[in-house]
């Protein structure tokens, strides 16, 4: 496995990761001494005392490097704060002008508003073959299997293409007064009646929604399908209650949900727009305007910007671990596992969950910080000197692809539970009960995705692939920390962060 990140001794007054996490699980006390990786979900910089970070007993025990090669840096890097502060009124005016210019260049991803419905929260034990699945939605025109939501209705590829060609080429068919029946085998016999059927069921050129559907239509469809499933499988009612419990726990555990984050990113909120940080001047202004949580400017003005940001992320990570731990305890069966296995599952799972939920705070241009009060641009983060400028780019690349799946909070609630209950983590003592719980969660996830995203037949397989991608991101993150270990001789790393990364990949 991987080497220990940081060879310095852990402060005798600090608990080990295992002891702290065990106490948190068994005694329901708040965990505040566990550290996690860079840029966790719901990131914010706060006023926690950083004296522990300045204690060099926690620093890397490495001889100073006399030379560091930064020749490959393409963007400018920034050295130390403080900077000379300009008159506040002048600074605000310049910021407003620059912000208008920058915001005009930012293309925020379209909102796909997360929505929760009890009808979408289903567990179902039996695995159904696609051909016999209750989720095989019929084409509204001919009754064939629908491939998605096209031109305002569920339609198969054949009828979608027929309608598109008719509209695009402005085709006029010979009138037929026979009112021909349109079904899978006869749909090509009478084009006039087929087109009339398309119009009758609601197909419209003004309702182009390839792969999407209105929320009202989705809820109606889910209600019909859920009713059918309940009649065929009475156990689904109990499973739905269980799924709702998971969703409720998710909402309680994670204050900044994807629904809230996307509302901020797309401007669909009554709250004040986030303060955009895109360069050093806007960063200084942001420190005055944003209620940062983990760093106060007066405490850390002497430190380099990249290090200040990195240290602030460490303290927010403590909160992230607490949130994830609380959620894990709500997963049915988790607290009944061996206590050592609970600790191991969280040790390996929290990183992957942090990056999963971090994606909710991101678009291709930047990331929300400080509980949505600020928005730090991707280019600014890349401009930080190496290796710090390299930390976030893999997370952005993952987030753009992950967000394309258009999951909502009800999907994520099950997905992160699946991540936690991974029976292949190294060092587990009793794998069987863990796999049993995960199998149930996987069945729940598969059915949830079929119900919530009926137009995306391959979504379950794509999401499972993301679990592999997340592990690769964690591995790359550990490798970057190894670089910091070798090059940043005066960089303090929280001792519990070293504990978590010990023997991790």
Curated annotation (Swiss-Prot):
Q: What SUPFAM superfamilies does the record point to?
A: Glucocorticoid receptor-like (DNA-binding domain), Nuclear receptor ligand-binding domain
Compartments in which it is found: Nucleus; Cytoplasm
Question: Which parts of this protein are zinc fingers (NR C4-type)?
Answer: 139-159, 176-198
According to the UniProt entry, the cross-link of type Glycyl lysine isopeptide (Lys-Gly) (interchain with G-Cter in ubiquitin) is at 252
Give details on activation and inhibition: PDPK1 activates its transcriptional activity independently of its kinase activity.
Arranged from A to Z, the UniProt key words for this protein are: Activator, Biological rhythms, Cytoplasm, DNA-binding, Glycoprotein, Isopeptide bond, Metal-binding, Nucleus, Phosphoprotein, Receptor, Transcription, Transcription regulation, Ubl conjugation, Zinc, Zinc-finger
Q: Which residues are in coiled coils? A: none
Q: Which residues bind DNA?
A: 136-210
Query: Where do the segments described as Interaction with FAM120B lie?
Result: 205-280
Sugar-bearing residue positions: 84
Phosphoserine (modified residue): where? Answer: 112
Q: Report a single Gene Ontology molecular function.
A: zinc ion binding
GO process terms (BP)? cell differentiation; cellular response to insulin stimulus; fatty acid metabolic process; hormone-mediated signaling pathway; intracellular receptor signaling pathway; negative regulation of cholesterol storage; negative regulation of inflammatory response; negative regulation of transcription by RNA polymerase II
An example of a Pfam family matching this protein is Hormone_recep
Q: In which tissues is it expressed?
A: Highest expression in adipose tissue. Lower in liver, heart, kidney, stomach, duodenum and colon.
Q: What does the UniProt record tell us about how this protein is modified after translation?
A: O-GlcNAcylation at Thr-84 reduces transcriptional activity in adipocytes.
Can you give the residue ranges of the NR LBD domain?
A: 238-503
- A single GO cellular-component term on record: nucleus
User: Motif 9aaTAD located where?
Assistant: 495-503
Q: What is its main location?
A: nucleus
Q: What quaternary arrangement does the UniProt entry report?
A: Interacts with FOXO1 (acetylated form). Heterodimer with other nuclear receptors, such as RXRA. The heterodimer with the retinoic acid receptor RXRA is called adipocyte-specific transcription factor ARF6. Interacts with NCOA6 coactivator, leading to a strong increase in transcription of target genes. Interacts with coactivator PPARBP, leading to a mild increase in transcription of target genes. Interacts with NOCA7 in a ligand-inducible manner. Interacts with NCOA1 and NCOA2 LXXLL motifs. Interacts with ASXL1, ASXL2, DNTTIP2, FAM120B, MAP2K1/MEK1, NR0B2, PDPK1, PRDM16, PRMT2 and TGFB1I1.
Q: What is known of its domains?
A: The 9aaTAD motif is a transactivation domain present in a large number of yeast and animal transcription factors.
Q: What does this protein do?
A: Nuclear receptor that binds peroxisome proliferators such as hypolipidemic drugs and fatty acids. Once activated by a ligand, the nuclear receptor binds to DNA specific PPAR response elements (PPRE) and modulates the transcription of its target genes, such as acyl-CoA oxidase. It therefore controls the peroxisomal beta-oxidation pathway of fatty acids. Key regulator of adipocyte differentiation and glucose homeostasis. ARF6 acts as a key regulator of the tissue-specific adipocyte P2 (aP2) enhancer.
Q: What is this protein called?
A: Peroxisome proliferator-activated receptor gamma
